Amino acid sequence: MMHQNHIFKHRPIDPTLYVADIAAIAIPAIHRHGEQEWHYATLACQLHGHVGIYSLLGVKMGLYARKQLNADLASMHVISHAGSTPPMSCFNDGLQVATGSTLGHGLIEVSHDSSPHTEAEFSLQEKHLHLCLKPSYNDIIQSEVAIAQARYGESAEYWHQIRQLAIKYWLEWDRDKIFEQVQ
């Protein structure tokens, strides 16, 4: 079994360690979602190269699945249905960070047998969990991203708006409420 924390002595939660828009949500996000989500979300953003909607959703789903299956880091097998094309595939980065089920450990695979969406299957021994983002949340993302794209095209301001949406969803969306089981 991997150690849970073998780089940091303490999780970096001090808001002064972060850029302004992330520092502004540090305390409320930690209060609302806990240090664990904060830690994995910030790691995922750093790994991913930017603050993105789908990588953060991957973190939230990965942590939710770990809780539901009572799974340690790097103990589950994950099948992602997010595909390999951005922006949806960014979900895979968040899943890997939050679950520890990485490509390097051979514990995650990406299914290409349907259109990409925020859905994943998690297995731990004989336990299995198949989750997706609730359609109402997906509709919010699609609507707000479409508005930003219509207004700004693919300009720098568009990417700024996407970052702001990601930060808003990170802070406001509770991982215990935004997913549902796939039957």
Language model segments and positions:
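Non-transmembrane, aqueous-exposed alpha-helical and coiled segments at domain scale
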Residues: M2-V51, S55-Q183
